[in-house]
Amino acid sequence: MDDLKALIGKVATGATLTREEASCAFDSMMSGEATPSQMGGLLMALRVRGETVDEITGAVAAMRSKMLRVTAPADAVDVVGTGGDGSGSVNVSTCASFIVAGAGVPVAKHGNRALSSKSGAADCLAALGIKIDLTPEQVGRCVNEAGIGFMFAPSHHPAMKNVGPTRVELATRTIFNLLGPLSNPAGVTRQMVGVFSRQWVQPLAQVLKNLGSDSVWVVHGSDGLDEITLAGPTFVAALENGNIRSFEVTPEDAGLSRAHGDALKGGDAEANAASLRGVLEGRPGAFRDVALLNAAAALIVAGKAKTLKDGVAFGTTSLDSGAAMNKLKQLIAVSNG
């Protein structure tokens, strides 16, 4: 506790924490040792000053050390967004996950209920008939038998219950909004991560490199989407062979047409589930295109596709052959089994 007081004092002066200090501070919070006032003080001091790569790396390390782990294939990928982009869009990364799985790449998806929309990944999947409140062993069975599994964050991060009330009372974004997507319980090293602000694209790629990821795309759409957007360019930081490269991609790079964000407005969980099922059944339109675009990037991360156009071709086959829809049916069956 005295250590935590010293670290809060350090941050209060504007100084930054080392990776080890941040890990120690967040361990205190997640173990329930820190008081609500101490948690709130540290979280807001970090937020106002701006969190560093070392601080985020240390915080993620602390969170990962307490999570309930899932056993998944070494080549599994995660397609995940921070949420909180305020767009209220359809569940793009969730739909893309089924396309990726249908293309033969195992998916260990990590997610939660809605942040700023009416339907987060967990809400949408539950509305599709998938049982989301599973044990780590049951999720591992889904990934290994169905080729796709969903890890509901509260089930795998029980230590987060110690910081939950403080986060609710602060009612503003904190470092915890970044930690979830970086703390996949299956320990995947191939990740496609969407973030709510361009400022985090490069830093989060660096954090994932620090923590041992192999292949990563961190993305932010120029229209604010925490996915690759159809509306214009998307900012990307890609980790490949130990190097981070920053660039932009457009729908045209993937052979797709642009579409305004309004075409992707979502509704509640039932409406978003119906839209997702429609894409898997072959319905054309902006939702299909944006899901293909994001799946294409995930297939690059997985090492299956070389370019976005390649990835779209694999994704199109996954949809048109019925393979993606079959993955949904398999996940419903195995999760409820």
From Swiss-Prot:
Its EC number is 2.4.2.18. Anthranilate 1 binds at residues 81, 112. It catalyses: N-(5-phospho-beta-D-ribosyl)anthranilate + diphosphate = 5-phospho-alpha-D-ribose 1-diphosphate + anthranilate. Pathway: Amino-acid biosynthesis; L-tryptophan biosynthesis; L-tryptophan from chorismate: step 2/5. GO terms for molecular function: anthranilate phosphoribosyltransferase activity; magnesium ion binding. GO terms for biological process: L-tryptophan biosynthetic process. 5-phospho-alpha-D-ribose 1-diphosphate binds at residues 81, 84-85, 89, 91-94, 109-117, 121. It holds the Pfam family Glycos_trans_3N. Mg(2+) 2 binds at residues 226-227. Binds 2 magnesium ions per monomer. The keyword Glycosyltransferase applies. Anthranilate 2 binds at residue 167. Its cofactor is Mg(2+). Mg(2+) 1 binds at residues 93, 227. Coiled coil: none annotated. One of its GO terms (cellular component) is cytosol. Keywords: Amino-acid biosynthesis, Aromatic amino acid biosynthesis, Glycosyltransferase, Magnesium, Metal-binding, Transferase, Tryptophan biosynthesis. NCBIfam families: trpD. Belongs to the anthranilate phosphoribosyltransferase family. Homodimer. HAMAP family: TrpD (MF_00211). PANTHER family: ANTHRANILATE PHOSPHORIBOSYLTRANSFERASE (PTHR43285:SF2). Catalyzes the transfer of the phosphoribosyl group of 5-phosphorylribose-1-pyrophosphate (PRPP) to anthranilate to yield N-(5'-phosphoribosyl)-anthranilate (PRA). This is Anthranilate phosphoribosyltransferase. The lineage of its organism: Bacteria, Pseudomonadati, Pseudomonadota, Alphaproteobacteria, Hyphomicrobiales.
